[in-house]
Amino acid sequence: MNTPTTTSVIIIDDHPLFRKGVSQLIALNDQLHLIGEASSGEEGLELARALEPDLILLDLNMKGMSGIETLRALRDADLAARILILTVSDAADDLVAAIRAGADGYLLKDMEPEELLARIVEAMRGRIVISESL
């Protein structure tokens, strides 16, 4: 069981290497606890319903169910999780679509690892987090 100061996290991303890197990064922060990984939106939705994480890191561009479709489904499932989009897309339209669909943040995958961890902590404090380069 997680203590109140620990944030449970799942990663939904179709790239195994990226999931592995982010999971190793999360392991470096005592406040974060990775409880699951999914390689598709469909799998991620199932996992989120079953595990009810505090935070979901969600890729935008995935095969099958897109990140926006997954985000909408997660919000429709009435999960309390904070959801951060973690993507390579710096397109303004994608950012706007994600925020409108209920994202709590929009972060670019090219950010420094320490910055990503700092933004995750900010998001868990209730802030909307968006990459500075946007």
Residue ranges and their predicted role:
Residues 51-57:
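Active-site beta3 strand of CheY-like receiver
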Residues 31-39, 47:
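Short hydrophobic/Thr-rich beta-strand motif most characteristic of the beta2 strand and flanking loop
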Residues 40-43, 65-69:
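Acidic catalytic/metal-coordinating carboxylates
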Residues 62:
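Receiver (REC) domain active-site loop signature in two-component systems and cognate sites
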Residues 93-100, 105-134:
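Short, flexible helix-to-coil linker/hinge segments that flank and couple to helix-turn-helix
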Residues 46, 68-79:
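Short amphipathic alpha-helix used as the core "switch/output" element in two-component signaling
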Residues 5-18, 22-26:
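Conserved acidic segment of CheY-like receiver
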